[in-house]
């Protein structure tokens, strides 16, 4: 699996970076002790050019995001197929596509560290994309409370703006965005979600002019969350265009480039 390559690559980079940072030059090597007399084989001195490390880092980041994008697009395609003709088989396929997309997102987290700025912007992205744990009942029904959640709230019109506004409104577990909100929609509270929960029905319009049918609202939330996920992951990937993180990294001194990569690795591992 290609994802494993991206998980292994950071480990290799860590070894390279550690070798660079800890390299012992002949000038700084300590004098050998006079006693006892021991014959040893000198350790090799690793002195990789910073351009090599930076190039490998950038190449891995861009490849990771490119493969992740394919998984997001596949997830979007499976979502549309499922909503067009809901069935238990298509729901299982959609759940599998979610798992693959989330796995790829997790593999690319190492490349989400800020370089010189915008740490708040990146933190917001991560918060909206991968918040955990979640209180599922804030979004949709749970067995003990079958009429709870935004989806079943007949006085709130659902939209992307509403979902963003309601996300962690009063508590960090009140999650209405990202992978785990989608996970709850697709599996339900007891992992026994039925495709019938997404069947389209005739609209049940409220006096305020929006649909209150829970299945239709669940379909709408699924559509909106996937669309927003694609938009946000695309923005993360765009950071590695020449005008984004790539330019910021290239502007750093070799020492700061190495420090940045090492800090990113330590935060990931």
Locate each region found by the language model.
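Bacterial signal peptide processing site
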Residues: 20-24
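N-terminal non-cleavable signal-anchor helices
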Residues: 12-13, 25, 39
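Mature extracytoplasmic or organellar-lumen-exposed domains after removal of signal/transit peptides
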Residues: 32-269
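Sec-dependent bacterial lipoprotein signal peptides
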Residues: 1-18
């Amino acid at each position: 699996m290609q994802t494993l390559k991206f998980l292994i690559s950071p480990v290799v980079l860590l070894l390279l970076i550690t070798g660079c940072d800890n390299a012992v030059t002949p000038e700084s090597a300590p004098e050998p002790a006079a006693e006892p007399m021991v014959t040893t084989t000198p350790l090799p001195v690793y002195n990789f050019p910073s351009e090599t490390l930076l190039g490998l880092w950038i190449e891995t980041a861009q490849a990771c995001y490119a493969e992740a994008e394919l998984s997001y697009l596949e997830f979007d395609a499976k979502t549309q197929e499922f909503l067009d003709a809901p069935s238990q088989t298509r729901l299982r396929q959609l759940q599998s596509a979610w798992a693959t997309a989330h796995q790829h997102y997790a593999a690319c987290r190492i490349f989400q560290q800020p370089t010189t700025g915008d740490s708040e912007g990146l933190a917001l992205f991560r918060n909206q994309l991968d918040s955990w744990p979640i209180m599922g009942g804030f979004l949709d029904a749970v067995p003990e409370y079958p009429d709870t959640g935004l989806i079943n709230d007949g006085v709130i019109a659902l939209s992307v703006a509403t979902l963003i506004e309601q996300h962690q409104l009063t508590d960090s577990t009140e999650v209405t965005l990202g992978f785990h909100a989608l996970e709850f929609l697709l599996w339900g509270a007891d992992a026994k979600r039925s495709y019938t929960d997404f069947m389209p029905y005739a609209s049940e319009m409220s006096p305020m002019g929006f649909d209150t049918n829970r299945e239709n609202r669940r379909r709408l939330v699924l559509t909106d969350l996937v669309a927003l996920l694609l938009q946000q992951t695309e923005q993360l990937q765009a950071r590695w265009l020449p005008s984004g993180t790539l330019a910021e990294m290239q502007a750093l001194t070799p020492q700061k480039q190495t420090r940045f990569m090492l800090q990113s690795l330590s935060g990931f591992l």
